[in-house]
Amino acid sequence: MTAPDSEHHASSPDPRRSLDMLRARLRAELPYLRRRWKIDQLGIFGSYVRGEETGDSDLDLLVTFTEKPDLFDYVALERHLEDLLGLSVDVGMTTELRPSFRDRIEQDVEYL
């Protein structure tokens, strides 16, 4: 007879709770992001959406802008989001994605 593996359950974070928290923070910030960076759509994709994130995972975001930002504004957006969320983010622009990559992302993106 083996002892139950209670340590595994106690140390495993609930990834959906993490994703829910990230969604809530982004939704609350979305009006400001739309005004400041002219964002039309913002979506989450990648490991967080699939529930495969680890402690080293960044948050993958897909953004559609009404006006394409210059490099300085793009970097400022990434930094703002990293400060807001407390983790590394990777912001991809819908218009800059290769079609094959865009097709893969569109399968699991969750727009806010």
Over which residues does each language-model region extend?
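Conserved histidines in hydrophobic membrane contexts and catalytic metal-binding motifs
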Residues: 44
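Catalytic core of pol beta-like nucleotidyltransferases
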Residues: 1-41, 49-55, 66-112
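Short hydrophobic/aromatic beta-strand micro-patches
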Residues: 62-64
